[in-house]
Amino acid sequence: MPILRSVAAVLAPFTSDTYMNTADSIFVITVTILTSIGFLLNLLLLYLIIWKSPRNLTPYRIFLANTTITQLVYALFAVTSMPRVLAKHQYTIVIYLGPVQFFGEWFSYMSYVGILHLSLNSFISLMLSMIYRYFSIRFKRFTANTSIILCIIGYFFPFLIFASCSNIAISSSLSFNTAVLDGMVENLESYHMVLTTEISNHPSLIILTLAVTCGLVPIYFVMYWCRHQIHKTLKQTRSVHSPSTRDNARRLVRALTIQSIIPLVSVFPASIFWCLSQLGFVEPTMYSYFIIPCLSLGCIADPVVTIRCVLPYRRWILKLCNMSTTDMITSNQDKSTIFQKH
C-alpha cells in the first residue's frame, strides 16, 4: 500500500530508496517505533542512573547502567539494520531494510550478529544483578570495583563470540540466494542487501544462536537459585539484617524477577518461530518479520520496570510530571529505602 510506504519513509527516511512491499513497510514502521521508544526510555534511565542515584545504590547502579547501555546500543543496531531473518535448512538468509545496507556486506552482517550478542549480554546482565544481590546479602560487602569487574567478565563471552564472527563467509550473489530461497521471497532481486551464510560451517554463529535461545535456561536456573538463596538467607539472619535491608532486598529481587519474565514474551516467541520454521510448520517469510520486533520488546520493558521499582527514579519522574503520590516517604526513610513495593 502506498500510504504505508510513505509512512515508513517518513519514520525511517534513510530507507526511502529501499524496495519494500507492504509487509516490509509494516515491519519498518514497527521496528522504528519500538526501537525509538526503547532508545528514549533507556536514555532517560541512564540519566537517572548517573545523576539521580543515591550513594547507597552505587554498586547496583553499575549493573543497571550495564543493562541500560546494552539496550541503548541494541536499539541503535536494530534501527540501523532492520534485518529480516530467514532460515532454510543449514542456511541463514538476512534481508536488510535499514541504512546499514549501504555500508557494505561486512557491516551489514556484523550488525545482525551485534543484535544477537547484545541480546545475550542483556540476559547475562540480569543474572549478574541477581548474583550481586545474593552476595551482598550473604557476605555484606560488594564494592563498585567488584561490580565493574563482574560486568566486564559477563560481557567477555558475548564479545568473544561477536569478534569470532567477523570472518564469517557470506554470499550476496543473487543467483545463489535465489537458489537457496527457491521462490520463498518475491522480487528478491529488488532488495539492495541480501546476505546468506551456511551456519554449519561456522561454529561461532551456531554457539551465538544457541546461546541466545537455549542459553536462557542456565541463566534462569542461576537467577532463581540466587532468588531462593536470598530469601533463605534473609529468613536465617533476621537478627543480623535490619528490617529496611530485608525489605530492600526483597523489593530488588521482585523487580529482577519481573525483568526475568520479559524474555518469555520477547526471546522465546522468536525462538519458537525459528524452530517451527525449521520444521516446516511456520512460513519462514512470516517468521522473518517477528524476530526483531519481539527482541525489541525487552528494550522497552526493562527501563519501565526499573523506573517503576527504584523509588528515587520513580519519584523524579513523578515530580517531573507534576504528579502527587500517596507513597511519598520521609527524608529519613529515603536514606534507607530504595525500592518501592508494587
Swiss-Prot record:
Family: Belongs to the nematode receptor-like protein srd family.
Gene3D superfamilies with a match to the protein in the record: Rhodopsin 7-helix transmembrane proteins
Membrane-spanning residues: 26-46, 62-82, 112-132, 148-168, 205-225, 261-281, 287-307
Name recorded for this polypeptide: Serpentine receptor class delta-33
Gene Ontology CC terms, in alphabetical order: membrane
Membrane-related topology note: Multi-pass membrane protein
Highest taxon above the source species: Eukaryota
Subcellular location: Membrane
Record-linked PANTHER family: SERPENTINE RECEPTOR CLASS DELTA-33, SERPENTINE RECEPTOR, CLASS D DELTA
Keywords assigned by UniProt, alphabetized: Membrane, Transmembrane, Transmembrane helix
